[in-house]
Amino acid sequence: MSLLSLPWLGLRPVATSPWLLLLLVVGSWLLARILAWTYAFYNNCRRLQCFPQPPKRNWFWGHLGLITPTEEGLKNSTQMSATYSQGFTVWLGPIIPFIVLCHPDTIRSITNASAAIAPKDNLFIRFLKPWLGEGILLSGGDKWSRHRRMLTPAFHFNILKSYITIFNKSANIMLDKWQHLASEGSSRLDMFEHISLMTLDSLQKCIFSFDSHCQERPSEYIATILELSALVEKRSQHILQHMDFLYYLSHDGRRFHRACRLVHDFTDAVIRERRRTLPTQGIDDFFKDKAKSKTLDFIDVLLLSKDEDGKALSDEDIRAEADTFMFGGHDTTASGLSWVLYNLARHPEYQERCRQEVQELLKDRDPKEIEWDDLAQLPFLTMCVKESLRLHPPAPFISRCCTQDIVLPDGRVIPKGITCLIDIIGVHHNPTVWPDPEVYDPFRFDPENSKGRSPLAFIPFSAGPRNCIGQAFAMAEMKVVLALMLLHFRFLPDHTEPRRKLELIMRAEGGLWLRVEPLNVSLQ
């Protein structure tokens, strides 16, 4: 037993135990951490004063409840972007600040920063990790850089060309369903429901060369993909379920675990089968067989990819990238197509001009087949797609965590450790960037009108090193499907105005309903 004596404080020697010493050490450590955090917090508050701040609800809630994933919340967000057009600070409660950037000049420093300086913030997308693994969406550092380089050939134009046939087939299956429904008197359809199923059908063929006929009959795999997306979205809205140990004890957590296992088993089975086929045939014979079918699918490209050192991707890596493509490719494209149909339904003059452009292009040709070279011959349709993506970007926000101080062009500094929100919808609705931003005007994207505009004024697929690797795939699919839809149907507004709803992507509450009228297709 040691004696603790502090005579200079007038205290008598007292006996001390190891527990008391441990308590003193732990207490001192906690006090030091609290003081360090307090200093850093107030230092950041001081440094953030250069960013304006919208009025809070109160000191405790901060701006919580003002920016919500609802129509009202999105309106509040775009209003803030209009008022504070160079960016602003919002507080999630009393101690968590975010910097919201909503102008091309201010987002440039973040989007152009390396993935090491401004990596993705994993606050919510970490819920996807048990499903998507260390794919390109969730990985970071050297692994992300290596995978990004190895995946780039999978989205080369020569590969994308072969997917056009798949886009045509999947779109025509959906349009035949619509013809059948219209003949039975059902002219009011939820665009999200039908188009999501069509994009999943296309992706399953492009990634796995597998046709589940999911648009014609139920598919367990496709139903599981939809279930996983819904469970991730539901989890993000319940604070207690953010803790893994609580979530996986819940009914939803067990459902999520089972669904992940089913999806992984499907992907693993495809990879194993290809691994068996490849060494048996040899690479040359493998390519010859693929040339006959005119399709080199995503799994094929990943199996054949090698990095600078000649190393291939592991089966686990291939599964992660295939599952990531399946997740990232269906909802975003479905959102983009659904909203462009909504905008064209509200502007029949633009819809008719797009239709005439497609009719002229396909004159004396098969009205159910769009070819790769046709995509460059649809300038007005492309302008309409881009203007819809401006008004209704599928992913309205992207978050980045600053690992070091980042200096903006105007001299303001975003402190290290602060999370930045790249407000894509704010940039797209910023009146200092886009005059009359709420008006749907495809002519904004006329080449003459685009001269001098910042490339960061329009970023539906993000920008910089971590932009969407599949954007060419998405644009090609949207243009093919939209051309075929406009050729065979007229789209009219529903009697109810949709209310935007932000989930994993931009949706509409209760679905996005439009009325469809079959057209008599004659291109002679």
Swiss-Prot record:
Catalysed transformations (reactions): an organic molecule + reduced [NADPH--hemoprotein reductase] + O2 = an alcohol + oxidized [NADPH--hemoprotein reductase] + H2O + H(+); (5Z,8Z,11Z,14Z)-eicosatetraenoate + reduced [NADPH--hemoprotein reductase] + O2 = 18-hydroxy-(5Z,8Z,11Z,14Z)-eicosatetraenoate + oxidized [NADPH--hemoprotein reductase] + H2O + H(+); (7Z,10Z,13Z,16Z,19Z)-docosapentaenoate + reduced [NADPH--hemoprotein reductase] + O2 = 10,11-epoxy-(7Z,13Z,16Z,19Z)-docosatetraenoate + oxidized [NADPH--hemoprotein reductase] + H2O + H(+); (7Z,10Z,13Z,16Z,19Z)-docosapentaenoate + reduced [NADPH--hemoprotein reductase] + O2 = 13,14-epoxy-(7Z,10Z,16Z,19Z)-docosatetraenoate + oxidized [NADPH--hemoprotein reductase] + H2O + H(+)
Residue numbers binding heme: 468
Enzyme class: oxidoreductase
Any one GO molecular-function label of the UniProt entry: iron ion binding
An annotated GO BP: very long-chain fatty acid metabolic process
Pathway(s) annotated for this protein in UniProt: Lipid metabolism; arachidonate metabolism
Keyword vocabulary terms for this entry: Endoplasmic reticulum, Fatty acid metabolism, Heme, Iron, Lipid metabolism, Membrane, Metal-binding, Microsome, Monooxygenase, Oxidoreductase, Transmembrane, Transmembrane helix
Presence of the UniProt keyword Cell membrane in the record: no
PROSITE patterns (UniProt xref): CYTOCHROME_P450 (PS00086)
GO cellular component: apical plasma membrane; cytoplasm; endoplasmic reticulum membrane; intracellular membrane-bounded organelle
UniProt superkingdom: Eukaryota
Keyword Iron: yes
Compartment(s) where it occurs, according to its Swiss-Prot or TrEMBL record: Endoplasmic reticulum membrane; Microsome membrane
Main location: endoplasmic reticulum
Cofactor(s) it depends on: heme
Entry's EC annotation: 1.14.14.1
Membrane-spanning ranges: 19-39, 87-107
Tissue: Expressed in small intestine, liver, colon and heart.
Family to which the UniProt record says this protein belongs: Belongs to the cytochrome P450 family.
Function: A cytochrome P450 monooxygenase involved in the metabolism of endogenous polyunsaturated fatty acids (PUFAs). Mechanistically, uses molecular oxygen inserting one oxygen atom into a substrate, and reducing the second into a water molecule, with two electrons provided by NADPH via cytochrome P450 reductase (CPR; NADPH-ferrihemoprotein reductase). Catalyzes the hydroxylation of carbon hydrogen bonds, with preference for omega-2 position. Metabolizes (5Z,8Z,11Z,14Z)-eicosatetraenoic acid (arachidonate) toward 18-hydroxy arachidonate.
Name of this protein: Cytochrome P450 4F12
